[in-house]
Amino acid sequence: EQTSLVVMDVGAAEPHIHHQGRAERPAVNVSRLLLLRSYAEAVAQGQLAPERRVALADVQRYHLKARGQGGHPAAIERLRGEGAITEDSLTIAALVRSMTQYNDEAAADWLLATLGYPAVDATREALGWPARATPLPSSGRTLSWRHPRMDATPAERLTVLTAQPRSAYAQEVLDLTGAFTASGSFRDEVLTLVQERGTEISLRDQRALAQATYPTACATEYAAFLTALLQDSLGSPAVSARMRSALERTVGADTLGGPLPVEAIGSVSGAFPGLISFAAYARRPDPLPDRIVVSFIQDLPIAVFYHMMQTGMDRALFVRLLSDDAYVEDTARFLAERETGG
């Protein structure tokens, strides 16, 4: 069994569902919530100004055209359509929203570099989470699997990376990110390789390398994190409010074919072959309590993974868990029967 699922209402004594919630699993994008927390703290302390404008070219240097790196172009197109990009620049606040709402991996890498890895790692450490929970630059992580100056095969890299201490791996990824974003021969070689031949790593090897190197996450811990965020107890109320403003989106009346008892959803999610990750809360109208859903799935068969991606089955499942009380009860009953062999 390779699925963690926690469904809970804010203020409730017990969760509706707590299925393998304490398992540590590799997760896609969800660790950006730690980045968001560090950003909100930096703003509150006067270290970063949300209205400061950033050259789009500075952000695009972090974009690597490889699997798991496709969110940035679509995000930029949406930001242009919204008028958030003028004279080829945008505010830090818009970049943060692009990271959280549009899955912009280049924006996430830029923000991590701007805040500094030590600051984000300190946020993780203050929560008492394991070292592997800290996000790393996605561009450098992908290059740690394979780059033009590497002789090792993907299988050999997997052996090395599995045994490597997290601190050493983090430094390697940060160094690769720095080399890639700087002007020079290494960047030119990487861009040429990716343009001509891709990453030269099979889908099966990419899946194994991702599970070995992505940040880990615990559904129970992220559910507690989101609970604190909704209760204004994640840092100061101002920090919590800034985080929510970057996360929340209103819900259309036609979602899942009909109106939902939900006013807004704040979520971070991601997928990579074999992995699906989702951490979200729903603000619901009184007297309904706000709801939290966190799920991490790993080792999905590739055929099943792509079927879920093509049909949107995963998204529909999570939205129903956020909004449909009867569906939550049915899911809880089904999981309980499975656990007892019923």
Per-region residue spans from a language model:
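Structured C-terminal helix/loop/strand segments within mature extracytoplasmic catalytic/sensor domains
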Residues: E1, E172-D175, A179-G342
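Active-site-adjacent loops and short helices of periplasmic peptidoglycan-processing enzymes
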Residues: E1-H147
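Mid-domain, small-residue-enriched loop/turn segments at the edges of structured enzyme/sensor domains
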Residues: Q2-T3, D88-I92, V96-L226
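Short, charge-rich amphipathic segments
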Residues: P26-V28, A49-V59, P148-Q164, V173-F180, ...
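Short, surface-exposed, charge-dense and proline/glycine-enriched linear segments
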Residues: V30-Y39, E77-S89, P137-R157, L161-D175, ...
